[in-house]
Amino acid sequence: MKKKIHPAYSQIIATCSCGNIIEIFSTVNVNLNLDICAKCHPFYTGKQRIIDTGGRVERFKKRFKLIKKDTV
């Protein structure tokens, strides 16, 4: 590697809104504030919420059937 052409690589602190502190290395010399991390993300914690759109789909199909019957 050529000398004096690469950016400075330093240790920074990334702080999550849940309070988790992560020390990482980066060329950006500014500490980061994160909205979500692996400790509080629903995918990693296993506390996923499944959104049930079945009721909406069924209601749409029901409306579509009524319109189709009226026009025929």
UniProtKB/Swiss-Prot annotation:
InterPro entries: Ribosomal_bL28/bL31-like_sf, Ribosomal_bL31, Ribosomal_bL31_A, Ribosomal_bL31_sf
Listed SUPFAM superfamilies: L28p-like
Sites where the protein binds Zn(2+): 16, 18, 37, 40
Entry keywords, A to Z: Metal-binding, Ribonucleoprotein, Ribosomal protein, RNA-binding, rRNA-binding, Zinc
GO MF annotations, alphabetized: metal ion binding; rRNA binding; structural constituent of ribosome
Cofactor section: Zn(2+)
Bound cofactor: record note: Binds 1 zinc ion per subunit.
Family: Belongs to the bacterial ribosomal protein bL31 family. Type A subfamily.
Record protein name field: Large ribosomal subunit protein bL31
UniProt organism field: Buchnera aphidicola subsp. Schizaphis graminum (strain Sg)
